[in-house]
Structures are given as structure tokens and as C-alpha cells.
Amino acid sequence: MLMVAALLSWFLVGLFIRASKARGWGQPVRKDGPQTHLVKEGTPTAGGVAFVLAMALVFFPLYLSGHAGGERELLIMLTALAMGVVGGVDDWLKIQSRMRGHGKKELLAREKFPLQFLVALVFAWLAAPLASHELVPSLGPVMDVVLIALVMVGSVNAFNFTDGLDGLLGGVAIIVLLPLLALSPVSALLVAVLLGFLWFNAHPARVFMGDMGSHAIGAVAAGAYILYADVWLLPIAAIIPVVAVLSVMIQVISFKTRGKRIFRMSPIQHHFELSGWPETHVTIRFWVITAVATAAVWWLLGARP
């Protein structure tokens, strides 16, 4: 079924690209970013819609027939879809704003964060009894729910900030999820559909992922590590998303308090681009870093009693 998922994703993403071009759904590009990105203006965006749909179309028949795990897998899948909807609203606003030349450009952080946190709280409430262990045993179940929710929101935003270069987030996500393939069918399905997506997202990308895809990825990664492994291993495997979101936070705090920027541009992948690294070098080097970190996680999982 993983091959079916990959092929279905490949087909739906290709269909999405053709439909997007016919309707003029394109990605606006920041003029203050790397000049090499200007050629990407108008590239179809929100391609995550296609691979998330492919994942759902394969998962639910498998689940209903008893071949996709139990309630933990259903919880991860539903959370990924809910987070994907939040990101999808953002994608839709961006596309509509570009096509009309006016209107609301995107969800503001103060609008997006409460929606993310609401989804995360529902997940945390249901996941806490199913998790492999309490995050901090001495704090009790209520704080465990709060911490799980914060991890979920942090993961969604960290993976979202990792997007922006051709193939970067898809490759990073596949590597991060590798240790959990045998444990979590949803993680395995996500890896499969991302392979289908990367066929078109590899440099030079014919489609961008958008927020729906990145939100779903962050939700699956957090859900799988919380329910099957050790949540504290997630920031090790996902070191690139962690650094990406930290670079944004540091940049904002520095500019607001000191009036100075630490990085040429944030998230940090764009800093390296503006420092002279070719886009493909940044992507592959970030994959390598993720692979080394995930190998350490794999070893730590194997060493657990």
C-alpha cells in the first residue's frame, strides 16, 4: 500500500499543478529575499493539499479494514488533517489575495496560533493516556496535557518554518520519520506520499508545499514521537526545524529590542543563501545534518530498555 500511496500522491500532485496553472494559483516571492528566488514567482503553491489528500484516501480504507493500526493512528491522522485545515486556510488566503490583488493576505499569528493550540489541546487530552510515558512524571496529568499541546504546536510551526527551499522540508520530514516507520502506519504513509510530492518539488520545483502540507507534517511528527517513542527525541531528529524556528524567534527579538538583525534573513536557510550558498547546497547539507541527528535517535531508541 505504500507504493499505492506514493503513486497516488504523484498523480494528484501532477493534477494539482495542471489545475493551479490553469487558474493562476501562484506563489508570490519576497523581493527582499534571495534574488535567485525571483524566477519562482508564480510557481503553483499549496501542493500539500494533494499529498495530504492522498494520505487520507489510503489511510481510511486501511483503518476501516483493520490494517492501519488502532486508535493512536486514527488520532495522529485526524490531528494531521485538522492542522492541515488551519494551514490550508492560510494557503487559500494567500492565493486569493494574489489573484485579486487585494484582501486579507494570510492568517495573522494571533489568529493562527489559537486555532493550532485548540487542535493541539484536543490531541493532547486524547493522547496523554495513550502516550508511551508521561513527559515529566512528577508534574502530573494536567501539566502533561499542556506540555503535549505545546510540543504539538511547536512542531507544527517548526516544520512550517523549514519550508522555503526546493525539496528541503520534504526530505527533512522523510528522514525524521524513518525511525518510526515500523511502528506508525501514518508515518509510513506520510513518507510514501512525500516521495510522490518530491518528484515535482525537487529543484527546480514545479510546485511548492504550502502551509497545509507543512502543518500536517509537523502534526504527524509530533504525534508519532509522543505516542510511540520519546517526545524528547523529536527535537534531536528535527534539529533543522528547531534551528529554523529559533532563528526566527532570535531575529524578531533582536530587531525589536536592539533594532538589529542577527541573520541576513530568517528562517536560517535563507541566511545561508544570502551568504552565498547555492540553494541545492543548503538543502542537501540540511538533509545530511538531519540524517546524522536521526541516526543518533535511532541508536537511542535501540538502546532503550
UniProtKB/Swiss-Prot annotation:
InterPro entries: Glycosyl_transferase_4, PNAcMuramoyl-5peptid_Trfase, PNAcMuramoyl-5peptid_Trfase_CS. The chain crosses the membrane at residues 1-21, 46-66, 73-93, 113-133, 139-159, 174-194, 207-227, 233-253, 282-302. The keyword Cell division applies. GO terms for cellular component: plasma membrane. Its EC number is 2.7.8.13. Its main location: membrane. It is an enzyme of class 2 (transferase). It comes from the Bacteria. It is a multi-pass membrane protein. It catalyses: UDP-N-acetyl-alpha-D-muramoyl-L-alanyl-gamma-D-glutamyl-meso-2,6-diaminopimeloyl-D-alanyl-D-alanine + di-trans,octa-cis-undecaprenyl phosphate = di-trans,octa-cis-undecaprenyl diphospho-N-acetyl-alpha-D-muramoyl-L-alanyl-D-glutamyl-meso-2,6-diaminopimeloyl-D-alanyl-D-alanine + UMP. It is found in: Cell membrane. The keyword NAD does not apply. Its cofactor is Mg(2+). GO terms for molecular function: metal ion binding; phospho-N-acetylmuramoyl-pentapeptide-transferase activity; UDP-N-acetylmuramoyl-L-alanyl-D-glutamyl-meso-2,6-diaminopimelyl-D-alanyl-D-alanine:undecaprenyl-phosphate transferase activity. Keywords: Cell cycle, Cell division, Cell membrane, Cell shape, Cell wall biogenesis/degradation, Magnesium, Membrane, Metal-binding, Peptidoglycan synthesis, Transferase, Transmembrane, Transmembrane helix. GO terms for biological process: cell division; cell wall organization; peptidoglycan biosynthetic process; regulation of cell shape. Pathway: Cell wall biogenesis; peptidoglycan biosynthesis. Belongs to the glycosyltransferase 4 family. MraY subfamily. Catalyzes the initial step of the lipid cycle reactions in the biosynthesis of the cell wall peptidoglycan: transfers peptidoglycan precursor phospho-MurNAc-pentapeptide from UDP-MurNAc-pentapeptide onto the lipid carrier undecaprenyl phosphate, yielding undecaprenyl-pyrophosphoryl-MurNAc-pentapeptide, known as lipid I. This is Phospho-N-acetylmuramoyl-pentapeptide-transferase. It comes from Deinococcus deserti (strain DSM 17065 / CIP 109153 / LMG 22923 / VCD115).
